From Swiss-Prot:
Subcellular location: Cytoplasm
Catalytic site: 95
Annotated organism of origin: Bacteroides thetaiotaomicron (strain ATCC 29148 / DSM 2079 / JCM 5827 / CCUG 10774 / NCTC 10582 / VPI-5482 / E50)
BP terms from Gene Ontology: coenzyme A biosynthetic process
Protein name, UniProt field: Type III pantothenate kinase
Pathway the protein takes part in: Cofactor biosynthesis; coenzyme A biosynthesis; CoA from (R)-pantothenate: step 1/5
Segments forming a coiled coil: none
Positions of K(+) binding: 116
Keyword Cytoplasm recorded: yes
Keywords on record: ATP-binding, Coenzyme A biosynthesis, Cytoplasm, Kinase, Metal-binding, Nucleotide-binding, Potassium, Transferase
Gene: coaX
UniProt-listed SUPFAM superfamilies: Actin-like ATPase domain
Length: 243
């Protein structure tokens, strides 16, 4: 059994995999990993992988150090099951490459665009030969709401909970429509441009932000919330024997 620990900017995901099948996944604060003890008692875990985008506090470091099985700490020197053409691998976020690996595992002989809509929106491309070319980074949903509030004098800070109109009828709905429709059109534009260059392109969407697309775009997307976890599990399996 594999233990997958994915520590993000605000939350941590802890998942258990039996080979390539996800058995259980939990989400908790990135300040502690309270579920570890119970999971270790419940399952026979043989190895684990830790991927983090933040500096870990002493409590989490102690919890991880106490685990009775080897851990792989993902970094830019970790061997990957895909080629990496990124010019600065030391600056590449683990979640970006893990999502690509997760998509490639499912369709190893296809050109793939991976879109992760989280704190930022990231666009990653891996070709049909398993070569990761890189990608783009754009502001995420909450970042857009906060920027409109912080960099203007009078626009309020709102969120996506409320009336959603195609065209705003007041300031609140105008901001909400601008953010949500802006994201929709941006993502649709990326897909259209990439499909023009790679006609057989597959598109994966992952991440925590939910938003709608028109039917023609939606039908062309594989939605997979656990793509990063699946990619981390594949990286761990690929490195079995190296830890």
């Amino acid at each position: 059994m594999n233990l997958i620990i994915d520590i993000g900017n605000t939350t941590a995901k802890v998942a258990l995999f039996n080979r390539s099948e996800m058995v259980e996944v939990l989400t908790e604060s990135n300040q502690s990993l309270d579920s570890l003890e119970a999971l270790c008692s419940k399952y026979r875990i043989e190895r684990g992988i830790v991927a983090t985008v933040v500096d870990l506090n002493e409590r989490i470091l102690a919890e991880l150090a106490a685990l009775p099985f080897p851990l792989l700490w993902l970094n830019h020197e970790t061997p990957l099951p895909v080629g990496n053409l990124y010019e600065t691998p030391e600056t590449l976020g683990y979640d970006r490459i893990a999502a690509v690996v997760g998509a490639n595992e499912q369709f190893p002989h296809n050109d793939i665009l991976v879109i992760d809509a989280g704190t930022c929106i990231t666009y990653e491309f891996i070709d049909s030969k398993g070569q990761y070319h890189g990608g783009n980074i754009s502001p995420g949903m909450q970042m857009r709401y906060k920027a409109l509030h912080q960099f203007t004098g009078r626009l309020p800070l709102i969120d996506s909970n409320g009336r959603k109109l195609p065209m705003g009828r007041d300031t609140e709905t105008a901001i909400r429509a601008g953010v949500l429709k802006g994201m929709e059109y941006e993502i649709s534009g990326y897909i259209e441009a990439m499909k023009h260059k790679y006609p057989e392109l597959l598109v994966f969407l992952t991440g925590g932000d939910d938003f709608s697309f028109d039917s023609s775009v939606k039908s062309a997307i594989f939605a997979d919330r656990f793509l990063v976890l699946k990619g981390l599990n594949r990286i761990l399996n690929y490195n079995n024997g190296r830890i």
